[in-house]
């Protein structure tokens, strides 16, 4: 496995692979890797001949008073985990390598970036799509792999790739959860012991809502209230947003008919905001 820090060196290696007609899969991450990321790497391994995993804490997707300075980093741990999980190349550039001077160009999927999580994190998704566009230009992958936990991000990246005619196919991978149901996240490491125990309320409330929908509940306000009451029963949880949307368009809904939906949560525990989601389709059975 190679660990590469410069764009020029990465391109040189990937050009050799392309000359040998090898398919390239890209897994973009911000590091501090966990089993959720490894599920993405394993999917990339299945879908491609060469797996590139990028590690870059992207400053332009963090807002004022967000957690850029305290975002967890551990490159030696990440390297060891990638070696165990079939990654061929880690691309771990510095900020100066990616943004050698103040960036003047950005990429934004306008309408989708300013709703849902975007209401609370202005310019966040513009930062995400800008770095993903740069990585697509640098790596030129055949496949790019994202987790479904960051569901709005997945939908936005799909739209950007379609709108800008990138060749890469976007593949989404289902959420990987801890044994108690908490979605794997790098931010989990920043939770206190008490907040970590409390955070399981997210997956629990989503499963209850899923069950209620599959039992026939159609009214979105009823489902939202069910989730809100459940989360508020945990004193350590502070709700940032609860959204119930069309699963592919992200339109907010008043009523659930036969369309696939997604329930999106953003909830703070102390100064750590966790996100989670549940996809529900009409023929799905409750877990």
Swiss-Prot record:
Chain positions recorded as (R)-pantoate binding sites: 61, 153
Species this chain originates from: Zymomonas mobilis subsp. mobilis (strain ATCC 31821 / ZM4 / CP4)
InterPro entries hit by this protein: Pantoate_ligase (IPR003721), Pantoate_ligase_C (IPR042176), Rossmann-like_a/b/a_fold (IPR014729)
Single Gene Ontology BP annotation: pantothenate biosynthetic process
Catalytic activity: (R)-pantoate + beta-alanine + ATP = (R)-pantothenate + AMP + diphosphate + H(+)
Subcellular location: Cytoplasm
Other facts noted in the record for this chain: The reaction proceeds by a bi uni uni bi ping pong mechanism.
Positions annotated as active site in the UniProt record: 37
Biological function: Catalyzes the condensation of pantoate with beta-alanine in an ATP-dependent reaction via a pantoyl-adenylate intermediate.
GO cellular component: cytosol
Keywords: ATP-binding, Cytoplasm, Ligase, Nucleotide-binding, Pantothenate biosynthesis
Protein name: Pantothenate synthetase
GO molecular function, one term: ATP binding
Pathway given in the UniProt record: Cofactor biosynthesis; (R)-pantothenate biosynthesis; (R)-pantothenate from (R)-pantoate and beta-alanine: step 1/1
Binding site for beta-alanine: 61
PANTHER family for the chain: CYTIDYLATE KINASE/PANTOATE-BETA-ALANINE LIGASE, PANTOATE--BETA-ALANINE LIGASE
Family according to the record: Belongs to the pantothenate synthetase family.
């Amino acid at each position: 496995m190679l660990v590469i820090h410069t764009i020029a060196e990465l391109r040189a290696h990937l050009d050799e692979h392309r000359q040998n007609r090898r398919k390239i899969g890209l897994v973009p991450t911000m590091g501090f890797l966990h089993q959720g990321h490894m599920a993405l790497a394993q999917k990339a391994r299945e879908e491609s001949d060469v797996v590139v995993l990028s590690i870059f804490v992207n400053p332009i997707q963090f807002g004022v008073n967000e957690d850029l300075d305290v975002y967890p980093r551990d490159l030696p741990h990440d390297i060891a985990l990638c070696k165990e999980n079939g990654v061929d190349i880690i691309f771990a550039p510095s900020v100066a390598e990616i943004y050698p001077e103040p960036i003047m160009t950005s990429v934004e999927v306008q309408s989708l970036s300013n709703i849902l999580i975007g209401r609370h994190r202005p310019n966040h998704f513009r930062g995400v799509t800008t770095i993903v566009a740069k990585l697509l230009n640098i790596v030129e992958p055949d496949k790019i792999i994202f987790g479904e936990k960051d569901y709005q991000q997945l939908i936005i990246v799909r739209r950007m790739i379609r709108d800008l005619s990138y060749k890469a196919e976007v593949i989404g991978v289902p959420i990987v959860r801890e044994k108690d149901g908490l979605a794997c996240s790098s931010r989990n490491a920043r939770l206190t012991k008490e907040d970590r125990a409390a955070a399981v309320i997210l997956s629990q409330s989503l499963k209850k809502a899923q069950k209620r929908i599959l039992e026939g509940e159609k009214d979105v306000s009823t489902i939202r209230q069910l989730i809100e009451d459940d989360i508020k029963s945990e004193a350590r949880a502070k709700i940032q947003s609860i959204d119930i949307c069309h699963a592919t368009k992200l339109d907010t809904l008043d009523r659930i008919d036969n369309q696939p939906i997604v329930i999106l949560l953003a909830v703070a525990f102390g100064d750590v905001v966790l996100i989670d989601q549940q996809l529900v389709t009409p023929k799905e059975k409750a877990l």
